[in-house]
């Protein structure tokens, strides 16, 4: 018992026990040191795990100065470090079965003092600040202190094994497929942003070499695990058929072949594994009293140092996934897993039907991995049972070769994803074919399951395999794909799908085309592949979408069938050709003939199918063109109908726009007084205004009322005005704009009275005013009928005399060059004629004058106006005044017979001025009306012939000549408008104007030679004619007049000379 007792606690570095009650409240100092020289009687020494060869770390704790909260935190920290120490101890124990590693917590002490606590209850602290120094890796401790602290002959064996690992790594580095794995994967450069989402623990050969050179690997097994992790990451991320996937598989096989020789050299011992308890029971291992700890240490001193193998640590994500899988199996929970969890929770005595509450965080990693394995086995068995009754549904993804679609990384015990490949280069695409059903053999499924299970168990030590195990529970319903293989592994060609797993199991699926045109080819292919284990592929018409179930008579169905025939024909023909080359060996000549026939048949079949496809395409194109043409025609018809409807609508709108007119009238009616209506200006101008307005429905217009009075407008009637003014209704300029229209109406109208009442109504009032201004000669002196008859008897003599005088006027007018100017201004001629006619047609004079007298006055006034125009052009104002004064003297000297003479002169003037044709066309009824203005000269001539007998023939000739002279009078009358001021002066003189009218044609001839004297002679002639008429001496006076006319002609020649000068 005198020997020093050995203590094997099996705790790794970093463990800090709870020593709050094991030490005294006084200050203490401890240190741990590893003895460099191994001696049989090991003594208690002080050493630290965090110490090195150059110094010793110390920590001074004063328990008396610690508060209760600080002590509680210290206990919690030590419990966490305890688990870390245990994990490190298991890694150290995995070096060799013959190696005995001394625990750093040897119960060695420098003194036997009772106050000294055991070294295993102490923790390692550095610095006075109370911060924990990170633990040193176990491999460094082994390299630096292993030879000095261990006197074991197997230590050199571990070093030699690591040397061989380095040699194997160099061989992998120089391998032809090893270049992609030399450096870490760069997701940015390779454009694979999801790399770290799939690969949780990346690794590469460059990192492994760096760790190996630094001595960070504590065991060759860690080295092998990192190498396997490098290749498994590449296989998991890259889909089958990818270049890097294939390279990873090849170099992984190369590594496994070299690792077998190294693995045999590693001394391994598998001590009995004691299941670890949950972390909830760790508190019981921490001594709260010194006595129980010493009893435990005494019990362990008799046993050899126990070494536990290293294990992997389950990450938080894996724990979470495991918990989700367990919750998913709540209804059908496996009994084995329930028993294991019941043992760990300490509820062994409970019945199996009770609920189990488990905290996954409280369980150890070893228990969690055991639960994970049991769960995977259960899910695998469940999947096998479901596969026996359910077929898997899959789609043909690509035409040929391997699939380039992204596949899920291979995970653990889950079956590796498989890809279906149809041999040939012209396979239909995904959108061209419905899903297909494949029923697999049970034996094949068993082989796949066993293969995947073995692969999962083989790589169970890697982190990638453990990570993939957590996702196997979610894929239990159906198989989505099958394992793809390279073309080199397809040793049995044919029409079908080849699937190989682990180079042993294969499955061949023959394509059975349902098209009628390829039945013969399918029979041939079926005969060639009778030795295959075939499963027919049938289109799933029941599960196909509705759009794919097309009626057999539709053009789309025929085009679809032709297209599929063409596609499947190429695939099956190529497969058949391959099968033909693999046929039985026979006569070469026979084979050659069969090959030629087969190729010929293939070409014919292909041409036929292509022709059918082309015909179907052409028919489809024609149908499409016809449909487009039909749609175009319908569209044109719709547009035409819309256009017609628009036209009808527009026409309706035009008709309805008349409502606005009535609305406007209603508004005007509302704004006026009671019973007042507001007509428009157009209605006021209309002659039928009253009649139209009487038919406007509710508008009751008074027929005898002026519409302007409803607007408050009244016309002022100034009858007492002395001067002639423009008519109130029509301006003088408007009348002058249409001069010839009025004269034409006078000539051609049979009812002159009615026409003049409408057209020259404005002139009646001025003429009436002139009549009033002329004094008693016109208004105050009634005409005696006897005098009128006497004057008519004297008219033939006067006409003959005047006719001779008119010859002189014709010569004077024709000799004047100024007549051209007068013609240009002929537009203004109508006004004086209208004025004279208005005066003669005035209602005031109709009551007092005979129609013949009024007619004579009109013609004489026209000639007077011509005379005024000529006189204004030849003489100045002073000469005109002298002549007018002479006329006034003669008028004043006249006696009561002046009225009679005026009547006679007016009658003569009328006969000379009025056009006989005008008189004939105007009115044939001279005797019936005094208001008719067209008293024709024919009636006057007829009366003269009755009275005068044979004198009528001679005078009629003179009248014709007078008419020719009067035809030129309008040219002279046009000058009246240029001298409106002079005319106004003549009209104002009253009596002077009447005297001028009496002068007749003679005043026109006397331009510059004493026209006043000639006027006196004319007046004397009037008196002489009256006397001759009374005495019957007519012929004598006519002869005298002829002589006087000769004198007047001479005077006219003098006038021509004056005008030329």
UniProtKB/Swiss-Prot annotation:
Regions of compositional bias (Polar residues) in chain numbering: 940-949
Highest taxon in the source lineage: Eukaryota
Compartments where found: Nucleus
UniProt keyword Cytoplasm present: no
Record SUPFAM superfamilies: Bromodomain
Gene Ontology process terms (BP): abscisic acid-activated signaling pathway; cellular response to potassium ion starvation; negative regulation of DNA-templated transcription; response to abscisic acid; response to cold; response to salt stress
NET domain mapped to chain residues: 304-386
GO cellular component: nucleus
Record keywords, A-Z: Abscisic acid signaling pathway, Bromodomain, Coiled coil, Nucleus, Repressor, Transcription, Transcription regulation
KW Nucleotidyltransferase (keyword) present: no
Tissue distribution of the protein: Widely expressed in all tissues.
Signals that turn on the gene: Up-regulated by potassium deprivation, by salt stress, cold and treatment with exogenous abscisic acid (ABA).
Matching InterPro entries: Bromodomain, Bromodomain-like_sf, Env_Response_Regulator, GTE_bromo, NET_dom, NET_sf
Chief place of localization: nucleus
Record's function text: Acts as a negative regulator in plant response to changes in environmental conditions through the control of ABA-regulated gene expression.
Name of protein: Transcription factor GTE10
């Amino acid at each position: 018992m005198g020997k020093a007792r050995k203590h094997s606690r099996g705790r790794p570095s970093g463990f800090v026990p709870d020593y709050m009650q094991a030490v005294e409240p006084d200050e203490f100092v401890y240190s741990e040191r590893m003895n460099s020289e191994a001696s049989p009687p090991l003594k208690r020494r002080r050493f630290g795990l965090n110490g090195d060869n150059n110094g010793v770390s110390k920590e001074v704790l004063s328990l008396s100065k610690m508060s209760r909260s600080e002590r509680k935190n210290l206990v919690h920290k030590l419990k966490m470090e305890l688990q870390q120490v245990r994990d490190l101890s298991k890694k150290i124990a995995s070096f060799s079965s013959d190696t005995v590693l001394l625990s750093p917590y040897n119960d060695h002490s420098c003194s036997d003092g009772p106050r000294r606590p055991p070294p295993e209850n102490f923790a390692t602290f550095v610095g006075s600040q109370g911060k924990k120094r990170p633990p040193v890796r176990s491999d460094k401790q082994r390299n630096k202190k292993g030879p000095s602290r261990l006197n074991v002959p197997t230590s050199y064996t571990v070093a030699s094994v690591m040397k061989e690992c380095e040699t194997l790594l160099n061989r992998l580095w120089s391998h032809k497929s090893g270049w992609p794995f030399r450096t870490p994967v760069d997701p940015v450069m390779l454009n694979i942003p999801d790399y770290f989402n799939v690969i949780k623990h990346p690794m590469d050969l460059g990192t492994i070499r760096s760790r190996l050179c630094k001595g960070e690997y504590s065991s060759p097994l860690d080295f092998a695990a990192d190498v396997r992790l490098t290749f498994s990451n590449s296989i998991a991320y890259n889909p089958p058929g990818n270049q890097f996937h294939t390279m990873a598989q090849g170099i992984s096989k190369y590594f496994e072949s070299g690792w077998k020789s190294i693995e045999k050299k590693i001394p391994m011992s598998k001590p009995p594994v004691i299941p670890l308890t949950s972390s909830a029971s760790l508190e019981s291992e921490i001594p709260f009293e010194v006595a129980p700890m010493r009893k435990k240490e005494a019990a362990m001193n008799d046993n050899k140092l126990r070494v536990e193998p290293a294990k992997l640590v389950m990450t938080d994500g894996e724990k979470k996934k495991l918990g989700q899988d367990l919750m998913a199996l709540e209804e059908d929970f496996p009994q084995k897993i329930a028993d294991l969890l019941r043992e760990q929770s300490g509820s062994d005595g409970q019945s199996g039907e009770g609920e189990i509450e488990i905290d996954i965080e409280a369980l150890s990693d070893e228990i969690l991995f055991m639960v994970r394995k049991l769960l995977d086995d259960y899910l695998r068995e469940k999947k096998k049972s479901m596969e026996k009754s359910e077929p898997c549904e899959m789609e043909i993804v690509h035409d040929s070769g391997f699939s380039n679609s992204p596949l899920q990384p291979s995970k653990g015990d889950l079956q590796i994803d498989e890809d279906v490949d149809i041999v040939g280069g012209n396979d239909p695409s995904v959108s061209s074919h419905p899903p297909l059903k494949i029923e697999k053999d049970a034996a094949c499924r068993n082989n796949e399951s066993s293969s995947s299970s073995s692969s999962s168990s083989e790589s169970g030590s890697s982190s990638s395999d453990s990570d993939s195990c957590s996702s196997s529970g979610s894929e239990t319903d159906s198989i989505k794909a099958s394992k793809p293989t390279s073309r080199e592994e397809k040793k049995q060609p044919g029409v079908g799908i080849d699937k190989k797993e682990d180079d042993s199991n294969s499955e061949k699926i023959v394509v059975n085309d349902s098209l009628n045109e390829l039945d013969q080819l399918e029979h041939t292919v079926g005969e060639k592949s009778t030795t295959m284990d075939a499963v027919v592929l049938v289109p799933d018409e029941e599960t196909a979408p509705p759009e794919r179930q097309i009626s057999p008579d539709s053009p789309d169905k025929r085009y679809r069938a032709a297209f599929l025939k063409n596609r499947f024909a190429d695939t099956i023909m190529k497969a058949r050709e391959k099968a033909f080359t693999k046929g039985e060996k026979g006569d070469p000549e026979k084979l050659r003939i069969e090959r030629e026939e087969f190729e010929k048949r293939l070409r014919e079949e292909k041409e036929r199918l292509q022709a059918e496809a082309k015909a179907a395409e052409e028919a489809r194109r024609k149908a499409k063109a016809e449909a487009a043409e039909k749609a175009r025609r319908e569209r044109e018809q719709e547009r035409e109908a819309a256009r017609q409807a628009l036209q009808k609508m527009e026409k309706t709108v035009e008709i309805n726009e008349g409502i606005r007119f009535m609305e406007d009238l209603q508004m005007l009616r509302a704004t006026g007084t009671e019973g007042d209506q507001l007509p428009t200006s157009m209605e006021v101008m209309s002659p039928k205004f009253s009649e139209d307005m009487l038919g406007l429905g509710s508008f009751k217009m008074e027929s005898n009322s002026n519409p302007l009075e409803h607007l408050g407008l009244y016309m002022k009637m100034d009858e007492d005005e002395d001067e002639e003014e423009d008519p109130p209704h029509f301006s003088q300029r408007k009348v002058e704009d249409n001069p010839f229209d009025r004269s034409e109406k006078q000539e051609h109208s049979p009812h002159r009275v009615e026409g003049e009442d409408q057209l020259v109504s404005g002139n009646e009032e001025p003429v009436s005013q002139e009549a009033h201004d002329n004094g008693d000669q016109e208004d105050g002196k009634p005409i005696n009928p006897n005098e009128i008859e006497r004057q008519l008897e004297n008219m033939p003599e006067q006409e003959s005399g005047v006719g001779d005088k008119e010859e002189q006027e014709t010569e004077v007018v024709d000799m004047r060059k100024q007549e051209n100017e007068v013609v240009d201004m002929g537009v203004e001629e109508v006004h004086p004629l209208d004025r004279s006619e208005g005066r003669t047609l005035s209602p005031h004079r109709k009551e007092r004058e005979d129609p013949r007298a009024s007619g004579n006055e009109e013609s004489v006034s026209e000639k007077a106006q011509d005379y005024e125009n000529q006189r204004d052009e030849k003489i100045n104002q002073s000469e005109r005044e002298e002549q007018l004064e002479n006329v006034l003297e003669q008028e004043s000297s006249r006696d009561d017979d002046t009225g009679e003479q005026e009547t006679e002169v007016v009658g003569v003037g009328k006969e000379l001025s009025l056009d006989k044709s005008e008189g004939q066309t105007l009115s044939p009824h001279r005797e019936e009306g005094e208001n008719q203005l067209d008293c024709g000269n024919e009636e006057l001539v007829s009366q003269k012939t009755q009275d005068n007998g044979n004198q009528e023939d001679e005078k009629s000739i003179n009248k014709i000549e007078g008419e020719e002279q009067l035809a030129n009078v309008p040219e002279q009358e046009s000058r009246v408008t240029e001298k409106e001021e002079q005319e106004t002066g003549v009209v104002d003189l009253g009596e002077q104007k009447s005297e001028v009218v009496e002068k007749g044609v003679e005043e026109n001839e006397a331009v510059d030679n004493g026209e006043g004297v000639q006027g006196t002679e004319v007046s004397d002639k009037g008196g002489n004619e009256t006397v001759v008429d009374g005495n019957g001496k007519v012929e004598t006076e006519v002869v005298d007049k002829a002589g006087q006319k000769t004198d007047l002609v001479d005077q006219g020649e003098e006038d021509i000379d004056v005008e030329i000068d």
